[in-house]
Amino acid sequence: MTDIHQHLWPPAFIDALRARAEAPRLDGWRLVLPDERPYSIDPSDHDPARRAAAAAAEGDERICISPAASLGLDRLDPAVAAELAEAWLDGALALGAPFAAWAMAGVLEPDAAALRDALDRGALGLELAADVLAAPDALERLAPLLEVLDNEGAALLVHPGPAGAQDDPGRPGWWAPVVPYVSQLHAAWWAWADGGRERFPDLPVCFAALAGLGPLHGERQRARGGDSGAVDPLTFVETSCYGTLAVDAVIRVLGVDVICHGTDRPYCDAAPLALGEAALNAIKIRNPGRLLARHPDKVPT
């Protein structure tokens, strides 16, 4: 089985975050992000042996890790973002099995050569912030990166970007994951639907957290003049932080063949899904395998 959405920071990446004088940075085990309340990190959450043991106990044989686009590292000065991307990938690849790594990239000056090198070194694909993909000019601005993925058949993981000032201290701790993160994913889902597949026909893309339940709004989109209809076999969603009710609802819209298993550990644990054996096999084994196979359009569903 494959979990396509976890976060585990290797030592080199932790050191790089601690070396920063400005947010986003780590102060010891205290995460400081621009305009957001500080967040205390449990060191054991980034212990590779502990994480691997937990995965093995649940039957996960491959754990796909990313730094988390919600840190906002992609929008730093391009040279700084590139250094952090290198520190991330060096450390993540050094972990070895059962871990596999998503690359990160700066978005102010997208570097196609650096992404191509990351894929050559073993990165699964690219983690991209949902708020970046949702921007009106995103497909044009991100074209250097998306073209690399499209040509290689390598996957794009769309993950929430920073909550920023919406993570107000007066709000409960669950506010950012439930409100700004979900709304970003919802917007990114429909931004991709509006021309993404036409421009990048071979790019497999997976939206975290069921794309903020964006797929459930197809009826409304069509009622307002849209033309969403046929399911795109290369546009996937993963299940992190959702249970049977939401997953079943999305399956009714998209079918089971584009639903992938993801947990968002260490921030969520996998909710047991009350689905049939065939559906669980598709979600946990077949679909992640197809997503992460280069050129999944050539892999039978």
Predicted regions and their residues:
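Mid-domain alpha/beta scaffold segments of enzyme catalytic cores
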Residues: M1-V132, E140
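Flexible, glycine- and charge-enriched loops at secondary-structure boundaries
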Residues: I41, P78-A85, V178, V182, ...
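A short acidic (Asp/Glu
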Residues: R75-L76, H217-R220, P272
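Secondary-structure boundary/capping positions in well-ordered alpha/beta enzyme cores
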Residues: P98-F99, L203, D257, H295
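Short beta->alpha linker loops
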Residues: A105-V107, A209, C241-Y242, I283
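Short glycine-enriched loops at secondary-structure junctions
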Residues: V107, P160-G164, P266-Y267
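Catalytic pocket-lining loop regions of alpha/beta-barrel enzymes
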Residues: D120-L254, V258-C260
